[in-house]
Amino acid sequence: MIAYLGNWQACPTPDQYAEYTHIVIAFAVSYTWSPSKNNCDSQCNIGSPVPICNNQNRQDLVDLWRSQGKKVIVSFGGAGMGGSWAGDNNDCWEYCFGKEASVVSQLDAIVRAQNFDGVDIDYEYFYNDGDAFSLPGSTGAKARYFLDTVTRDLKATLPAGQNLITHAPMEPDSEKGTEYYDILKANAANLDFLMPQYYNGWTRPALDGLTGTGAGSKAALPHYNDLVYDMFGGDATKVVFGFCISDCSGTGTNANAVQASAVMTELGGYHSCNGGAFFWVVNHDYGGAWSGPVGDAAGVGGSNCDA
């Protein structure tokens, strides 16, 4: 059970994080927030130390969670760095293109200083040739080189035992046939797991189940199976199914505990030993009322993976 913790939101309580196996700190960014358009750092300087929760660096919580056996991962990116959807004008990712070595060095320093277990790349921006980039000289090729190089070099640079690497792509971006899919597949050996967002895209598993359509235009299971079989050679433990609790009403993709539990139970019928679930966001997991039942359905603790 992997939980995204919005680091501007309240710090979680023990009854919230009891079920979590991983906590992803969202987000490390290279901007300062502004309501109309975020103020990008032109040199892609990443804010440090990265806040943990309540806009504060709570090293005590990171150390506590790790002492309990949880993995604490810092996520670089998020929607505020730039989104590929209509109406979004943030473009901070573009200032990072060509600065791969600096990005890797900065994230390595952050991981070491704050005792994180690794890095998540949360990239929801453009990567195709001909996409609507903002800055002169920005291209799909530069975006793809950035994603590939940062992924590869982080795995090689982060210290042993603190070098978990993952991505959390939007579901259409991780669809077989896209350039992003190809980058992820080429880096399969560098990815400890992948967290596709089944709430930002074509599928509506909370309403349609894994194999149906209706609310969504595509079914989730074929997408998931491509990741399992084509990208990760049949290892379903590498693919973590993504949910949004209540921030995604605009796309009709919220999943309550009953709906998400049903999806995970259904997924267990196809892949008895899978990568479990992740969700956005801790602030909406009131008292663990979402993560508790969904974790039970997902078999958190590995009960479904026993030989």
Regions found by a protein language model. Name each.
Residues 1-261, 271-272, 287-296, 300-301:
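Chitinase-like catalytic core of GlcNAc-active glycosidases
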